């Protein structure tokens, strides 16, 4: 039996279908904890109870109805404990919108291997546009690497999901899954327009470089194996 800590909150999601994914795994026992309470379980001592942390959260952002969101620094103790877990070799799986978490902590993008930007900013010292999103996209996904994460996954499959036009450090990750969707600005909507101007599904005047079709990857940082899906 594998024990995982499942961390959520910060972005809406369909709760019961999501929990059912883990309920249907006969060899997995999970403990569900929401942010910020979950931060107390990020330590070497607490981590001994779990084989991996699975993060479906989006901490560090406070959305405002009339202006840009606030980006919050992670508590110093939590950040230190998180980095200690990475150095010690703990396993982490980050899911979907988790890549937008802790935007004020640049090192968080280095852990995940990329970032979704709600606002224009800088990444690795370079200016970057705000990221794009597109809901309910039906597309085909290809498995591009033999890896334990993709074991028993069909080499090609169709899925309907929200896609991102975001930043991925492709040179620093091992690709696992790629999409056949076209990741260009015309096919996505501006994240900044959504959260600042309250204009959903809008890309008027928005410009963004073509992006990666990478949907899932793994990387090693410190002694930890990191997976993003």
Over which residues does each language-model region extend?
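An acidic, glycine-rich "communication" segment
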Residues: 2, 95-191
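Short alpha-beta junction capping motif
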Residues: 47-105, 223
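Beta-strand-turn-beta hairpins that frame and shape the catalytic cleft
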Residues: 1-2, 220-227
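Solvent-exposed loop/turn segments at secondary-structure junctions
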Residues: 11-12, 37-38, 59-62, 98-102, ...
């Amino acid at each position: 039996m594998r024990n995982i800590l499942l961390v959520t909150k910060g972005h809406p999601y369909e709760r019961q279908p999501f929990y059912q994914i883990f309920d249907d795994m006969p060899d997995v026992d999970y403990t569900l904890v929401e942010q910020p309470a979950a931060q107390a379980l990020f330590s070497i001592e607490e981590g001994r109870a779990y084989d991996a942390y699975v993060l479906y959260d989006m901490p560090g952002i406070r959305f405002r109805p009339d202006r840009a969101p606030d980006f919050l620094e992670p508590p110093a103790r939590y950040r230190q404990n998180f980095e200690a877990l990475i150095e010690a070799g703990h396993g982490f799986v980050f899911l979907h919108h988790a890549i937008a978490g802790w935007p004020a902590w640049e090192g968080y993008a280095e852990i995940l291997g990329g970032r979704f930007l709600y606002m224009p900013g800088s990444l690795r010292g370079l200016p970057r546009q705000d990221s794009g999103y597109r809901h309910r996209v039906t597309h085909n996904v290809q498995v591009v690497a033999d890896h334990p994460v993709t074991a028993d996954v069909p080499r090609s499959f169709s899925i309907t999901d929200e896609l991102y036009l975001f930043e991925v450090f492709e040179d620093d990750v091992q690709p696992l899954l790629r999409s056949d969707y076209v990741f260009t600005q015309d096919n996505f909507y501006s994240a900044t327009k959504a959260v600042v101007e309250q204009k959903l599904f809008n890309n008027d005047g928005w410009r963004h470089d073509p992006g990666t079709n990478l949907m899932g990857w793994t990387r090693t940082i410190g002694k930890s194996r990191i997976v993003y899906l």
